[in-house]
């Protein structure tokens, strides 16, 4: 057994050494894995929707900071995000005190900022804690004062006050385009038929519907893979009640629930189809409970809940996002990635340019591979010609084709047994199943003959990865302003342009992708005078 483990370790080390040799020569390793993707330009297979154009920001009042505003504005402009999910909007610190009453001025500033920058609010109205996570078992409640749950009488009063304020300030038509969610706080006992959660949800629902039946109110942020069995009981309770949510919301972090010594704990999962598989399980549970809700949201999703997992900063995260945005199209109505900005978890230990947080933009405003994954998704056309394991092929139906593709590598068993905040930068390759490149051959049939301009955008360890650029700076702490600006301007996708000519109605392209690489291929017919 020991000899077998030594042999496997040697094989793994040899693969890594081979990969590094190619990296030094600035070449791509030869692909041993090859896939053929053939589509027909005349056959539309489906639609790519805007379901993934949502982001969880966290505590809404972070948007009072100019730094956060600048980064969110950049995020919206370059990725096309449409919904911004925020919580703690009813915090005692910012808008309510039992002594002085209500003051919604700061809330108005937050909402005005979102609307001024073409973002629709997705409002979580519960008392959701702002947790700083090292691992699922180790967290810090950064601001305890914000998370106390109002008693029912106070909650009832403040909900009615804030709802009438929003209607008067923004109008019913505007509020019909927002989402209002109420979180399943464990202290409200939704697993009991007379649990206070349902009373509070009904109050919020009835208050909003008083102004318009078209205002969307839902809940309750159930955790996929962790609360699945509890959900059957909750759905059966909810089914028997008069008021049902307009949408059900879920969180997806790649963990499964295990019972150890009588306690339920979360263990990391390496299922590469985790979100899709867990969502299918949840749909079956809904069917069994005879609780059919037409709209399903995943309002927080990531492979990790940790704010200190260096894979968040790596090319792995870009490939993970692109893969899941492709896979989940058509399965849910909204997916809001967790989360937007590293500023959310800016803490005493954030003394380096990257800290393993899951924001799309670093605290210094540097875009990560995860940011570019959403940028690539935003450029897809709406008509789908083909959806595959490693790619999606889209068109506008007028000689314009856009392909997004990836070489996502699943996490390895070694990842399962390593604390997330203990993964080292130099060991990243050891936490994926393999480091093999892939060759993707695309053929689009029945296209118009003539010349096409092909633009290829790449994000890999040589282009668009701030983590790998930082390596060239020796992972130094306390970078000077010009060094941060260098990273900011250099961590961008590479671009290649070429013209190809089609003579037989078939457009053929070959792409070799290294591990965790993502690409966007924009193909535009060139008309003659």
Positions of predicted regions on the chain:
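Substrate-binding cleft and catalytic face of glycoside hydrolase catalytic domains
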Residues: 79-270, 281
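Short, acidic/polar
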Residues: 41, 62-76, 165, 228-238, ...
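Mature N-terminal, pre-catalytic/accessory segment of carbohydrate-active enzymes
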Residues: 1-81, 515, 527-529
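C-terminal beta-strand-rich structural cap/linker in extracellular carbohydrate-active enzymes
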Residues: 478-529
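Carbohydrate-binding surface patches
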Residues: 390-472, 513-522
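Glycoside hydrolase catalytic-domain groove-lining segments
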Residues: 255-309, 333-342, 384
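Conserved, mostly hydrophobic/aromatic
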Residues: 54, 114, 162, 180, ...
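Aromatic/acidic polysaccharide-binding cleft in carbohydrate-active enzymes
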Residues: 298-424
């Amino acid at each position: 057994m020991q000899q077998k483990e030594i042999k496997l370790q040697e094989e793994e080390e040899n693969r890594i050494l081979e990969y590094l040799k190619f990296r030094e020569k600035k070449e791509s390793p030869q692909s041993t894995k090859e896939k053929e993707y053939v589509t027909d330009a005349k056959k539309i297979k489906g639609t790519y929707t805007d379901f993934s154009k949502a982001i969880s920001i966290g505590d809404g009042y972070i948007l009072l900071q100019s730094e956060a505003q600048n980064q969110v504005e950049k995020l919206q402009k370059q990725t096309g995000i449409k919904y911004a999910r925020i919580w703690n909007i009813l915090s005692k610190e910012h808008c309510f005190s039992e002594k002085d009453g209500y003051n919604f001025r700061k809330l108005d500033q937050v909402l005005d900022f979102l609307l001024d920058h073409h973002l629709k609010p997705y409002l979580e109205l519960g008392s959701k804690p702002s947790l700083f996570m090292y691992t699922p078992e180790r967290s810090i409640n950064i601001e305890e004062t914000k998370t106390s749950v109002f008693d029912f009488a106070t909650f009832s009063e403040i909900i009615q006050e804030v709802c009438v304020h929003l209607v008067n300030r923004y109008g019913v038509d505007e509020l019909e385009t927002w989402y209002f969610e109420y979180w399943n706080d464990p202290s409200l006992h939704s697993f009991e038929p007379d649990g206070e959660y349902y009373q509070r949800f009904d109050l919020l629902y009835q208050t909003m519907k008083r102004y318009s039946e078209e205002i969307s109110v839902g809940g309750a942020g159930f955790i996929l893979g962790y609360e699945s069995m509890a959900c059957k009981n909750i759905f059966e309770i909810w089914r028997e009640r008069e008021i049902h949510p307009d949408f059900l919301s879920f969180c997806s972090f790649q963990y499964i629930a295990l019972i150890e010594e009588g306690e339920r704990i979360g263990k990391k999962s390496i299922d590469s189809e985790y979100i899709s598989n867990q969502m299918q399980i949840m749909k079956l549970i809904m069917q069994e409970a005879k609780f059919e809700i037409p709209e399903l949201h995943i309002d927080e999703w990531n492979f990790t809940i940790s704010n200190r997992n260096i894979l968040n900063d790596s090319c792995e995260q870009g490939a993970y996002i692109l893969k899941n945005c492709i896979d989940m199209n058509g399965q849910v109505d909204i997916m809001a990635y967790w989360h937007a900005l590293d500023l959310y978890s800016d803490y005493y230990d954030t003394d380096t340019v990257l800290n393993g947080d899951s924001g799309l933009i670093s605290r210094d405003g540097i875009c990560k591979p995860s940011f570019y994954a959403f940028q690539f998704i935003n450029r897809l056309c709406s008509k789908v010609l083909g959806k595959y394991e490693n790619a999606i092929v889209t068109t506008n139906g007028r000689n314009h084709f856009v392909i997004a593709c990836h070489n996502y590598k699943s996490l390895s068993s070694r990842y399962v047994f390593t604390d997330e905040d203990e993964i080292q930068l130099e060991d990243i390759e050891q936490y994926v199943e393999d480091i093999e490149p892939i060759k993707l051959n695309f053929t689009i049939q029945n296209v118009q003959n003539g010349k096409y301009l092909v633009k290829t955008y790449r994000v890999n360890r040589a282009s668009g990865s701030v983590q790998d650029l930082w390596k060239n700076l020796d992972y130094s702490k306390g970078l000077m302003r010009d060094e941060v600006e260098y990273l900011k301007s250099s961590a961008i996708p590479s671009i290649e342009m070429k013209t190809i000519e089609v003579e037989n109605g078939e457009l053929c392209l070959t792409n070799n992708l290294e591990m965790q690489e993502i690409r966007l291929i924009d193909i535009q017919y060139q008309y003659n005078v």
